[in-house]
């Protein structure tokens, strides 16, 4: 059956409702689920459906949800506070074990200097992540949040992935929900979606066994959304996963989004094997065709996600422009600083002026946004 026939009657979901406030405990469905895509249809999108038709359908879904031609971006930076990690992920070239001569950990003041540097360049978001360092006390993290909020009120502290939050809890002898409560009290309101990789038990056991199964990531975001946090959902594909694993990932985050509507965007990117333990088996990362297929399929399958991000940094600027015609409505960030992909021998840089130019060249109107997708300026 042709793709157009398969999805002729599909309609984009209504816009997501607001995420619940901190005291809301009941589920808050965010989409009309009666006519959403099935796993079989998702499998078709990710395998044998003609790529350009998948892209065209995804573009229709994008404009059904957001009729204007605005493409947003955020001015941000992505520094790291430590490369010390005890998790030994097979895909990571960035980490060093405790005691390694190349291991480092920044002081609170050194991290805040990076936040200040980003703020002086106009950043409104700092995405701060690091390794799982058992030597760092909980107060280190809470101080970073409080000081960022106090000293740089224009900057959103988009700090600490789910696995880092689990590490904080283990070191402090607390529950991860206690950590979420303390981060909230310190002033944090958003959480990055990194560390999801592919939410498949088989895949995570192969590439990141010490991180636990999919639930270890999902439970943090579930409880964060219950408390009123917003977060992103990411996916790093192109290593040991199958199409069924990708669909497991889609199903898991779609189901969680039905509960609270706390995800602001879906952000996929391809694995970069350079300098990693997986490099011996995976010599080359996936190309643009696979990226565009995954992106477009996500726009169609994740009917309750308000935004899909074009990962220019990992996939290249030209692919980022094409992604805007395959369902993406957000360009991502400036990433003034980024070290994880750099460690895998993959480097890409961009300026605000270049972002504006690239979005316009693709036929869209650029608009600067906040972490939570509020428009600050239209160009």
Language model segments and positions:
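Glycine-rich, proline-tolerant flexible connector loops at the mouths of alpha/beta enzymes
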Residues: 73-79, 96-102, 127-139, 201, ...
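Auxiliary Fe-S-binding modules of radical SAM enzymes
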Residues: 1-16, 23-52, 60, 113, ...
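Conserved, mostly hydrophobic/aromatic
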Residues: 34, 58, 89, 128, ...
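Conserved SAM/AdoMet-binding glycine-rich loop
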Residues: 123-221, 225-231, 239, 307
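Short, electropositive alpha-helical surface patch
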Residues: 141-153, 174-186, 242-260, 292, ...
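N-terminal pre-triad scaffold of radical SAM enzymes
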Residues: 55-98, 103-129
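Hydrophobic faces of well-ordered beta-strands that scaffold small-molecule active sites
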Residues: 71-77, 126, 157-161, 191-193, ...
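Active-site-proximal loop/turn and secondary-structure-junction residues that shape catalytic pockets
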Residues: 77-79, 132-134, 161-165, 195-198, ...
């Amino acid at each position: 059956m042709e793709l157009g026939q398969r999805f002729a009657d599909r309609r984009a979901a209504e816009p997501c409702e607001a995420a619940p406030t901190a005291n809301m405990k009941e589920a808050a469905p965010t989409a009309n689920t009666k006519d959403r895509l099935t796993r079989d249809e998702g499998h078709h999108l990710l395998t044998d459906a003609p790529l350009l038709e998948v892209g065209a359908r995804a573009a229709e879904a994008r404009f059904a949800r957001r009729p204007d031609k605005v493409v947003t971006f955020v001015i941000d930076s992505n520094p790291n506070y430590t490369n010390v990690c005890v998790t030994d992920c097979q895909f990571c070239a960035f980490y060093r074990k405790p005691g390694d001569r190349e291991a480092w950990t920044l002081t609170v003041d050194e991290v805040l200097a990076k936040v200040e540097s980003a703020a002086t360049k106009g950043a409104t978001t700092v995405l701060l992540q690091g390794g799982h360092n058992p030597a760092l006390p909980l107060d280190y993290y809470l101080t970073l949040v409080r000081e960022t909020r106090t000293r740089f009120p224009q900057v959103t502290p988009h700090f600490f992935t789910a696995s880092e939050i689990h590490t904080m809890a283990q070191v402090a002898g607390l529950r991860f929900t206690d950590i979420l409560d303390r981060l909230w009290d310190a002033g944090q309101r958003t959480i990055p979606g990194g560390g999801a990789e592919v939410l498949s038990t088989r895949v995570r056991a192969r590439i990141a066994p010490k991180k636990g199964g999919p639930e270890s990531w999902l439970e943090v975001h579930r409880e964060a959304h219950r408390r009123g946090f917003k977060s992103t959902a990411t996916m790093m594909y192109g290593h040991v996963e199958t199409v069924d694993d990708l669909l497991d990932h889609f199903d898991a985050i779609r189901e969680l989004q039905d509960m609270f509507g706390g995800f602001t965007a879906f952000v996929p990117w391809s694995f970069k094997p350079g300098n990693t333990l997986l490099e011996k088996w995976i010599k080359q990362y996936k190309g643009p065709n696979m990226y565009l297929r995954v992106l477009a399929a996500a726009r169609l399958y994740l009917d309750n996600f308000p935004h899909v991000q074009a990962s220019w940094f990992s996939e290249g600027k030209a692919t980022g422009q094409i992604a805007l015609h395959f369902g993406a409505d957000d360009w991502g960030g400036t990433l003034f600083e980024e070290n994880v992909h750099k460690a895998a021998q993959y480097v890409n840089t961009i300026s605000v002026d270049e972002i504006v130019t690239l979005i316009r060249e693709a036929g869209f109107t650029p608009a600067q946004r906040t972490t939570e997708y509020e428009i600050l300026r239209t160009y």
